[in-house]
Amino acid sequence: MSPHLTRRLLAGLPLLAVIGSNGCSAPDRDGNQAAASPTATTPASVPTPIQPATPAAAVTATPAAAVPSAAELYRLVAPVALFPDRLLAQVLAAATHPDQIAAEADMLRQNPGLNAAALQAALTPQPWDPAVKGLASFPDVLNQMDRSPAWTAALGRAYTSDSTDLMNAVQVLRQRAVNQGHLKSTPQQTVVSRTVTTQTVTSGELVPAPQSYVEIEPAQPDVVYVPSYNPALVYGEDYGVWPGYYEADGGFDAGWSGGLIGFGAGIAVGALLSHPWGWHHWGMHWGGPPPPGAGMDGWR
């Protein structure tokens, strides 16, 4: 299985220009430019002793980031694996810009209570990635990423360097939550399991692609409920906590009823449809490459 976010922003590589300089002969004492001559009769001067070259400064190579193990990938995605597909897509893309996450969270703290129009006006001139701007509509998610910068950065690196294993880990955890009876359709969300018809095998996968995948969508197209759950309980196995990850304020169990997955107030996303960071510009396509025409406007 080769899952894809259906909105990819590609960064170009800078070109390095090498500028050379032409050597010039030095003027003599009378200010005349000396000309090289193969038949010059001037006695050769005593060669200047060659000075030992100054050793070049040692270049310290930056070690490549270690590839997370399968167990580490489970631990890394456990807090967000049960998010609705479109929100998960935004979180993964935004995690590749941890500095922008911090800047946006700081802006919202300094300007609390912005209505939809004021929020859009504040976001439009910012040079942030569309995924980061989109999370402004989900302040609890944004704040969680901001207060756990080490986890956020690790999530972004894993998505950039090993997205296949990362997304396979998401599906493994979703399937385990389904098997435990905790992940299911509710008035807030629709959960659908589908069988993979065409299996794509990638050499060296740390997390084998599952035979089925689980989609999570809002029950109402324009109202999103962000799930709250304890990763140590909802999957039937405790994968531990990623170093530097801090749970939401108030823990995981305040006000829950009817299961291990709770929901707060619904977030209306209809007002954001016409903006490039709006909810419907994001999506997730499981089980293979995205269909033709998915492009930058997302796959629905």
Regions found by a protein language model. Give the residues of each.
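Bacterial N-terminal signal peptides that target proteins for export
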Residues: 2-11
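Hydrophobic helical h-region of N-terminal Sec-dependent signal peptides
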Residues: 11-15, 269
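C-terminal motif of bacterial Sec signal peptides marking the signal peptidase cleavage site
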Residues: 20-23
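Low-complexity, repeat-rich tail regions
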Residues: 25-27, 165-173, 178-300
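Post-signal peptide N-terminal segment of mature Sec-exported envelope proteins
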Residues: 32-67
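Mature N-terminal segment immediately following signal peptide/propeptide cleavage
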Residues: 65-91
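Mature extracellular/secreted ectodomains of secretory-pathway proteins
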Residues: 80-81, 87, 91-206
